[in-house]
Amino acid sequence: MTKARDVMTKDATCVQEGQTLADAARLMRDLDVGALPICGDDNRLKGMVTDRDIVVRCIAEGGDPTSTGVMTLAQGKPVTIGADDDITVALRTMSEHQVRRLPVIDGHDLVGMISQADIARNLPDESIGDLVEAISR
């Protein structure tokens, strides 16, 4: 049984809850990622922000990413997975919520991120197509 902690990207970089969408966009560019966890001063997960959120929900609506806080786009409780959950649980969670990445939580602490690609690298070749299809619906 492969666990989320075995395939996740450790030490996920957070954008802080007081930062702007422009700060988040620069951090995404620098890290070459499409999503970032939003963390509070206690380094606990407060939400998620994606490059698509910034474009569609801020810029396309006439918003100013240099003055709009990241928490403006955080919606509800973020979907997460436990560090000791099996990757099949991660896959099912991604499929149910139509997301490609999940924050990995151990207790209340953010310990990493797991992506569709992380899971695909650890699946038999014949299962990869099923993964992509399930998440892309």
How should each PLM-predicted stretch be described?
Residues 28-31, 36-52, 94, 102-117:
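A glycine-centered beta-loop-beta connector
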Residues 7, 25-27, 41-43, 61-63:
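Short hydrophobic/aromatic-rich motifs at helix boundaries and adjacent loops
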Residues 1-11, 50-95, 110-137:
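Tandem CBS (Bateman) regulatory domains
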Residues 14-32, 39, 81-98, 105, ...:
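The conserved cystathionine-beta-synthase
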Residues 64, 99-102:
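Residues in soluble alpha-helical coiled-coils and helical-bundle/repeat scaffolds
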